Amino acid sequence: MVIEVVRIGQRLVRDDRVTTHVALVSRAFGAERIFMTEINPEIKDTLGKINDTWGGNFEIEFIDSWKPIVKKKKEEGFKIVHLSMYGEKINDAQEEIRKEENLLIVVGAEKVPREIYELADFNVGVGSQPHSEISALAILLDRIQGGQQFEKEFPNAKRKIIPTKTGKNVQVKETRD
């Protein structure tokens, strides 16, 4: 399954941290790429450093507008999943979404244009109360992958966490500069 995420907009200042966390969750929970509009370029640098240290090749692509990428992905056969607290319950939609091969998940920051609701193949709600888009994305990604994203290996990692019941164990790969 190919999973990509598009982040629509950003509320100035307050959202740099939230948008960074949307990208981090996307990466850690199995997405291959995130498309972002109106973003502080430092976020791309941060994610580049994460890839360099922790491995993987997660991509960030800056876009001028969400609409062309959503339409293009739809034409390529991607199913569009819009995260919205107004959508159908995730418990009711997750099985059908799991069957899809390619997904583009839309995560809004500001008021989402009505057109997104119409373009989406799935409008999915993680609870019907106000909540964080970060938590909604994490829950959706976990539900549709059934926890398998946690088995993913991140190639070329300089550091790797070794799960342990107590303490912490980080394997550090020696590098020569």
Curated annotation (Swiss-Prot):
Pfam families in UniProt:
Trm56 (PF01994)
Any one GO CC term of this protein is: cytoplasm
**Per its UniProt record, what InterPro entries does this chain match?**
Alpha/beta_knot_MTases (IPR029028), tRNA_m1G_MTases_N (IPR029026), tRNA_mtfrase_aTrm56 (IPR002845)
Give GO terms: molecular function aspect only. tRNA (cytidine(56)-2'-O)-methyltransferase activity
Q: Which reaction does it catalyse?
A: cytidine(56) in tRNA + S-adenosyl-L-methionine = 2'-O-methylcytidine(56) in tRNA + S-adenosyl-L-homocysteine + H(+)
Please classify the protein's predominant subcellular localization into one broad category.
cytoplasm
Which domain of life does this protein belong to? Archaea
- The Enzyme Commission number assigned here is 2.1.1.206
Q: Which residues bind S-adenosyl-L-methionine?
A: 83, 108-112
Q: Where in the cell is it found?
A: Cytoplasm
Instruction: Give the UniProt record's GO annotations in the biological process aspect.
Output: tRNA nucleoside ribose methylation
Q: What is known about what this protein does?
A: Specifically catalyzes the AdoMet-dependent 2'-O-ribose methylation of cytidine at position 56 in tRNAs.
Read off the PANTHER family from this record: TRNA (CYTIDINE(56)-2'-O)-METHYLTRANSFERASE (PTHR42197:SF1)
| Listed HAMAP family | tRNA_methyltr_aTrm56
Q: What does the subunit section of this Swiss-Prot or TrEMBL entry state?
A: Homodimer.
**Protein name, as recorded:** tRNA (cytidine(56)-2'-O)-methyltransferase
Q: What is the lineage of its organism?
A: Archaea, Nitrososphaerota, Nitrososphaeria, Nitrosopumilales, Nitrosopumilaceae
